[in-house]
Every structure is written in structure tokens, then in C-alpha cells.
Amino acid sequence: MSENSSDSDSSCGWTVISHEGSDIEMLNSVTPTDSCEPAPECSSLEQEELQALQIEQGESSQNGTVLMEETAYPALEETSSTIEAEEQKIPEDSIYIGTASDDSDIVTLEPPKLEEIGNQEVVIVEEAQSSEDFNMGSSSSSQYTFCQPETVFSSQPSDDESSSDETSNQPSPAFRRRRARKKTVSASESEDRLVAEQETEPSKELSKRQFSSGLNKCVILALVIAISMGFGHFYGTIQIQKRQQLVRKIHEDELNDMKDYLSQCQQEQESFIDYKSLKENLARCWTLTEAEKMSFETQKTNLATENQYLRVSLEKEEKALSSLQEELNKLREQIRILEDKGTSTELVKENQKLKQHLEEEKQKKHSFLSQRETLLTEAKMLKRELERERLVTTALRGELQQLSGSQLHGKSDSPNVYTEKKEIAILRERLTELERKLTFEQQRSDLWERLYVEAKDQNGKQGTDGKKKGGRGSHRAKNKSKETFLGSVKETFDAMKNSTKEFVRHHKEKIKQAKEAVKENLKKFSDSVKSTFRHFKDTTKNIFDEKGNKRFGATKEAAEKPRTVFSDYLHPQYKAPTENHHNRGPTMQNDGRKEKPVHFKEFRKNTNSKKCSPGHDCRENSHSFRKACSGVFDCAQQESMSLFNTVVNPIRMDEFRQIIQRYMLKELDTFCHWNELDQFINKFFLNGVFIHDQKLFTDFVNDVKDYLRNMKEYEVDNDGVFEKLDEYIYRHFFGHTFSPPYGPRSVYIKPCHYSSL
């Protein structure tokens, strides 16, 4: 179908519309009874059917149902079959007769019968239903609809009808055709025409055949339309699938785009964070580079100044070197002049004297070495004696063990078993003390031997140093004479001679001092060893004598005698010691440039002297003035080191008084003599510090103890209240109670002081 032409045909109600020119032909079935009268019933029925068809077609077009290719072909076949059936139903007698008026160019065809109209309506309804059943509507790409023929309502012609009656409002069921206006014909002429038409009935058959051929064309056209609709539907389904695929693709692309966008945003965030960190790192690097730049600039300036300073110093050194080279050349010239003159007789004599003096010194050294060898042999002899005494002690220990064993096997009911056990314990304690003493003496002998060797080595080093110093002094004198050019060669030799004399004199003095020190030390050592062993023998002899007396029924008073001996031995400061105990425990005394070992001199208290009383000054009876120490601090440290193996600072008065108060409160309920005791104590303190350089602290403690004992209130029935006062004081200041001044010396340990009141 084209835009300019559209043809439609059916058995009843088919309308063929052609826009070729301005003519319109309408064909309707005409009955012989109703040729020219309008049928209002038919027109109303046709209007209702047309309205229903239009509504159904609108709904079908709105629904836009889509048919597959399989349903298209049976729908076409059914439509073709219905058309053929309708053609057969049409009666042969039905002849389309048109009426024409002479006065107008409109030809009116008579409407068909009511039965035919009903059949046509049924066919139209079936076609509409089939179109709805088969969904022959429109696709998404192209829509095809079957349009029902529109009824043209024309006004009923009047007697005076003309061409202007077309605009009348009265509808007519007949179809009209507008033709070219002809001239008006008279009534006679119309009658002639009717006669002529009746004569031309055979020509109607030809028109019928032409109509059937037109109907066939319409059927073919409908088939073409159906096929085109099927193809359009198929093409529409393909397009829909393609569009769905496109939509899916679009959704997938959108999802991918969103994912890419999210990943891009995340990357941008990370890049932003990285950018921040890079920015911070760049700032740090910038600050570091700035600092390095500043340091480099400062170093550069420092190096420049240092370089300039070195240049100046180099120039000065070059000048000094040139001047020294000039002086050296001058000195060489002077030496050559002196060599040419030759050596004088005075120089030869001085050299001979120096050689003799050196030979004498060598002889003295040889004699000193021989004396040293003799002293070493004496030391070895003393060591042997020590070993013998040790063997004796071991033998005594064996005898003691035998005695203890025999006592255990003896009668346990005897009254003297308990006392014998006590004596055995005392003897064992004495033996342990003697062993300690022997070990200490052996260690001390080793110490003196080592000190002797060190003194000898130091003397040798000093001799070599003196020689070197003499050479240096002569060299300096020469340089001085050469530099000033005021001295002469004689002055240089005089300086050398004087320096060598001083060295020899100093060396002699050192050798004498070393000899005296070694002799004195060895003599004191041997005397101390002999006295200790003599004392050991006496004590052991007394012990065994006492043991024999006890066995044969000696009295209890005789048994108490060795205990006093042992107590005197444990506390030798209460007993008048021999001369061998004066110098025990080496100390170091400062002598010029070198420290030399000197024995510390212990001081004792005279047991025969009077005891301290409240009215007596104990400083008169004290022989504690120190000759080997200087100052309060030195004497306090020497006393604490020799007696307690610790180093203690001088004792303060307030601390000592607090200790006595604490002891009194602990042992006594009341003590009313604080003022008297303070007056007695104040005599031994100067500026709040004890006078260690005038009196031993142990003697002072014993004096305080005796002073408290001699008070009238505590002379009788004191129950030994003050017996442990000295131990309490020693424990506070020195960390332990008083012990004999032998045994190996320990490293300095600070005493643990108890908290004062």
C-alpha cells in the first residue's frame, strides 16, 4: 500500500477507496424492495458495530501484542478461508444497483438487506475475534491495523437538491460518488435512460465479474498484508531480543563503569595519601638538606679559617727551621774548632774520677745483692720453722682428738665430764685461733718478701731513671750553652759531673734505706714469728698441765687458770705484750716521691695501772700517742684497719652518746648520771670528734666501761650489766665485735651502722 492510495474490499461492507483523482465510489448491496429508501435500523446497527470494532482495534493497538512466526501463517490461512466462505454465501441474485439523480453528480447505491448485514456483522465480529485471538496487532517496530469502512451519512435529498446538499447534517446510509456535474436532463430523458439501463442488463454480469476480480485482488492484498505483518512481527521480536541484549550490555557496561569508577576513586584516595606522605617526606628531606647545607657551610668556613691558620703557622715554622739550620751550622763550626784545639788534661782527670766512682758503686751493688741473698735464705729458714710449727699443731690436734675420744668412752656419770667437754671446746677454739695466726704469719712473710722484691725493682728503675736524667740534664746544659752562646765546653762538663754526683748520692741513699727497711722488716718478722710460736708452746703446755691436774683431782680454781690465759690471749691489749708485737700489720708511709712499707705500731694499755674512776683522768695512764700516724683521720683509719679489718672515719661525740643511751635504756631501767658521764666523755673529744691521734678508741671504750663499773650504784649486784658494752659499741661502729689483730686483711668494707635512737 502506498500513501496516496488504499483499497479495501469485502463481501458485505467492504469499501474500496481510491484517491486517484477526486472521484469516490461507494458500493452497497441493493434489494429490489428498498431501492431508494434509507434504512435507519441498518444505519444504527452499523454505527454500533463500527464503534465496537474501533474500541476493540484500539485495545488491540494499545496492548501491542506480539505474535511469533509460527502463529502468523495459520492466521492468514483462516482469514483466507473465511473470505472464500463468505463469497459462496453471497446470493447470486444480489445485485448492486445504484441510483442516480439527474440533477446531481452523486450516484447512490442501495443498502444491502438486513440478513446480509447480519451476516456481515458476524463475519466482522469473527474477524475481530480472530484478530484478537491471533494478536495480529502492532509490533514495536511497525503497527498494522484493520480499519472498518466508515459510513458516510448524507442528508436525504429533497426535490430541490443541488450540489450544495453535501453539507447537510442528515445522515444517509447509502454511499455516494461525486462525479463531474453534467447538464440537467429533463424527465423525458431520464425515462429514456431507465429504458436504456434495463436494456443493458447483460452488461451487469460483466461488472460482477469485474467485482469478483477486484475481490480477489483484495484477498491477495490482505494476504500480502498478513505476510508483511508476520515478517514485521518476526523482525520486531528479533529487534526486541537485540534491544534486551543491548540493555543487558548497557547494564553490564554501567556496572563495569561503576566498578572502574570505585577502583579509580580508591586509587585516587591511595594516591592522595601517598601524596601526603611524599609531601611530608619531601619536607623532612628539605629540612635535612637545609641543615646539612648549613653544617657544610659552617664546616667550609671553619676549614677556610683553619687553612689560613695552618698557612700562617707553616710560614712561622719555615722561618724557625731556617733559623735553627743557621744555628746548627754555627754549632758545627764551633765543634770543629774545639776538636781542632783538642781535649785538655782537666777533662781527662774528671773522666778518671767518674770511672772510679762508678766502680765503687758497682761494688756496693754486689754487696747489696749478697746481703739480699742472705736475707732470702733467712726467710726460707723462717718458712721452714713455720712448717715445723704447723706440724706440731697438727700433732696437738691429734692428741686432743684422742683425749676427746677417750673421754667419750670413759664414764659419763663422773662429775668432771661436763667441765672436760668445755675445756675440749676451749682447746679446739685455741687451736683454730693458732691456725689462723699461723696462716696470717705465712701470708705476712709472703707479703714482706714481695715488698722486698718490689723495693729492689723500684731502686733499679730509679737508678736507670737517674742516669737518664743526668744525661738529659747535661744535654740541656749543652743546648743552653749552645743556644745562648755564653757558655763553653767546660761548663757543660761541669754540669755533667754535678748531675752524676747527685745521681750517685741519691742512689746510695736509696740503697741504704732499702737495706735498713729490709733488715728491720725481716727482724721484726722473725721476732713476731718466734714470739707467737713461743706463746703457742706456753699455752699448749699450760693446757696439758691443767688437763693432768684435773685428771688427778685438781680443784676447780686450778681449772679456771688457763681460761684467764686464753682470755688474755684473745684480748692482747689487756696484757702487757712483748716487744715483738709492736709492729704488726704494714702500712704505707709517704717518703718523697715513693711510698715505702712501714709497720703499724700497736699501743697497749698497762694492766698494772690504775683503773679509771669518776675522779681520775684516764688520759694519764694511756700510752696511746701515735708516732706512725698523722692526724685524726689517718689514726682512726689505721686503728680500725688493724683491729677490725675495716676503714672507719673518726668517731663523733653525738653518735657515741646515742649508742650509750640506747644500751642503758636496753639494760637498765633508770640511769641518773648522764651529766657526770658527759663530763667524762667530753675530755676525749675535740670539736665533737674523738682524739684518735692521742688515744686508742678501744682504750677509751674500756675506760668508759670501767668508769661505769666503778660507780657506787653498780659496784655491788650489777650482774654484769656493762660486760657487753664494748661489744655493743664495736658492733655499731665496726660491724662486728672486737677480734685479735691478726688474720688476712680484707678489702675495704663499709661497716653497717644500726639506726640510732
From Swiss-Prot:
User: Its principal location?
Assistant: membrane
Question: What residue spans carry the Basic residues bias annotation?
Answer: 175-184, 469-479
Which segments carry the region annotation Disordered? 152-207, 458-483
| Keywords of the record | Cell cycle, Coiled coil, Membrane, Phosphoprotein, Signal-anchor, Transmembrane, Transmembrane helix
InterPro entries given in the database record:
CCPG1/PBIP1
Q: Which residues form a coiled coil?
A: 248-272, 306-450, 504-530
Give all Phosphoserine modified positions.
Answer: S186
Q: Which residues form the signal peptide?
A: none
- Topological domain spans for side Lumenal: 239-757
GO BP, one annotated term = positive regulation of transcription by RNA polymerase II
Q: Report one GO cellular component.
A: membrane
Lipid bilayer topology: Single-pass type II membrane protein
Which compartment or compartments is the protein found in? Answer: Cytoplasmic granule membrane
Which ranges sit in the Cytoplasmic compartment? 1-217
Q: What sections of the protein cross the membrane?
A: 218-238
**Basic and acidic residues: compositionally biased ranges:** 190-207, 458-468
Give the function comment from the record. Acts as an assembly platform for Rho protein signaling complexes. Limits guanine nucleotide exchange activity of MCF2L toward RHOA, which results in an inhibition of both its transcriptional activation ability and its transforming activity. Does not inhibit activity of MCF2L toward CDC42, or activity of MCF2 toward either RHOA or CDC42. May be involved in cell cycle regulation.
Self-association and partners: Interacts with MCF2L. May interact with MCF2, ARHGEF1, BCR, VAV1 and FGD1, but not with TIAM1. Interacts with GTP-bound CDC42 and SRC.
The name under which this protein is listed is Cell cycle progression protein 1
Could you tell me which species this protein originates from?
Homo sapiens
